[in-house]
Amino acid sequence: MSIKQLSETLINQIAAGEVIERPASAAKELIENAIDAGASRIEIATAGGGKALLRITDNGCGMDGQDLALAVRRHCTSKLNESLMDIKSLGFRGEALPSIGSVARLTIASRRADSASAFQIAVEGGKVGEVRPAPGNPGTVVEVRDLFFATPARLKFLKTERAEAAAITEMVKRMAIAFPKIRFVLSGSDRSTLELPATGDDHLARIAQVLGPDFRDNAIALDAEREDVHLGGFAGVPTFNRGNSAHQYAFVNGRPVQDKLILSAIRGAYAETVPHGRYPVAVLALTVDPALVDVNVHPAKSDVRFRDPGLVRGLIVGAIRQSLTREGDRSSTAGAGAMLRAFRPGANGGFSEGAQAAANNSYAPAYGARPPQPSAWSVDTSPHRPLDDGQNRFDGLALPAARADAHVSPSQISEPVAMAMESGRFRLGAARAQVHANYIVAQTQDGLVIVDQHAAHERLVFEDMRKALSGRRLPSQGLLIPEIIGLPEEDCDRLMDHAENLDRLGLAIERFGPGAIAVRETPAMLGEVDVPGLVRQLADEIAEWETAGSLFARLEHVAATMACHGSVRSGRLLRVEEMNALLRKMEETPGSGQCNHGRPTYIELKLSDIERLFGRS
């Protein structure tokens, strides 16, 4: 069979198969054209999930009749000259319009601002019509009907109208975040409308429009630079997380991308701070010299290739971690919001259904719950006791031992602590009570804080262990009688393969015959610990990450497990000075707003919110 030149229509249909995968792909290409044209207002109308109709209206620079005729021809563009190494526009290939026109019914009407008349051209299944005069305002209107009518096999691979419409909405949100100075309006056939007014230079306001106002309250600003790469944007606190990665947005020179390198860097930055199966919320904006990034590696331009990927990844991981550390013990406000919603009075004047259920069960012990136990954790023996030179800060706090139903009257708080609370020096306030032998209630300058004592202390122990990891071996305590633990042979082998790493953490183990491990030393900072439970859990977790991760990451993972076993447990009564020592240590420790599993360690309620619940504001 002889080789022959393909027809222009077939060439465009092949290109459409790469560039236009679904209605959202077509909408993205057309919106990029509108942005490149300098539009400040873009309206998107859809019907049938974008399959029946896509109409993009903008107030950009527009085109005259000559440009319009060239725009529907393949590889005709005003955005590229001779080099692919200096691309500053979103589009540059000149493929979108001819590709769409080859598989749909395409109509374009456009008018330049300095022209008295508009022009129109139609393309149907690759057949290009003539340019004709037409009425119209300055700007461009692109209308796509019956997408893929010329390639009906493609229609079988599209999802439902609802799913395709959702994909268009998500794409518009990504574009809107990247360009806050542009007003976006999206309307569907079901009369639903997404309207995003322009926010100018206030990127966080635009992000809040898309992700909701909660993100504004839980966002940390990013501003870091390394060599020729700048990172801006916002990262959510670890406890503000979601069930999937759909709320992770990345932009390179204003271009929305879903790049694996960037998404991997986000995961690495939040390692050990977000629960398994949960995903942090982040909006990252990278500004790179165009010569240092290749945007022409994917047909849909959703991936990029950096000249120095290691530099970019290191910048992202380092900037996010430093920002999280700088925020210290900050935790998500979502927990407080959920609590307020639960206790908001219902229509009948009582509590809402969730609050009523909680009230009905407030004095009923949970199934299988242990009764309160005397504390085996003491401020005097804990590695997290106050420093000697700071002990005076807690003078006067030797109140009666807190019980599960204990409370502290205002007169019982010492004058130094009261003054510190008024000045705001103690951000987490002073302990008022311990309820259900699990939660510490503290009064702050402008509200109250509820602390999960186990989760908080677990984080403190972990941070101390992680800090010690960067230096010498962690201090250990020898066991008077070695603990012999029976394990499956494969678990014994795994533990012994990592015996050196465990020894750095203060856990000294050795073989004790077939199917057994002898533990001779445990980390000193853990105090009394369930050694068999700790070793068995370590064996299980080592089996999961045995072939992945760096040494330090593995050691951190082990440290997190050890911290959980060595922390003050739920159900233990604490003295008031112990509670306050825990609060002070939390204030000093970066990342103490969430435990090692990513759950919040405390919830803060502002006085204004509490007063609203009682109708006092």
Swiss-Prot record:
One of its GO terms (molecular function) is mismatched DNA binding. Signal peptide: none annotated. Residues 363-394 are annotated as: Disordered. One of its GO terms (cellular component) is mismatch repair complex. Residues 382-392 have a biased composition (Basic and acidic residues). One of its GO terms (biological process) is mismatch repair. Pfam families: DNA_mis_repair (PF01119), HATPase_c_3 (PF13589), MutL_C (PF08676). Keywords: DNA damage, DNA repair. PANTHER family: DNA MISMATCH REPAIR PROTEIN MLH, PMS, MUTL (PTHR10073), DNA MISMATCH REPAIR PROTEIN MLH1 (PTHR10073:SF12). This protein is involved in the repair of mismatches in DNA. It is required for dam-dependent methyl-directed DNA mismatch repair. May act as a 'molecular matchmaker', a protein that promotes the formation of a stable complex between two or more DNA-binding proteins in an ATP-dependent manner without itself being part of a final effector complex. Belongs to the DNA mismatch repair MutL/HexB family. This is DNA mismatch repair protein MutL. The lineage of its organism: Bacteria, Pseudomonadati, Pseudomonadota, Alphaproteobacteria, Hyphomicrobiales. The gene is mutL.
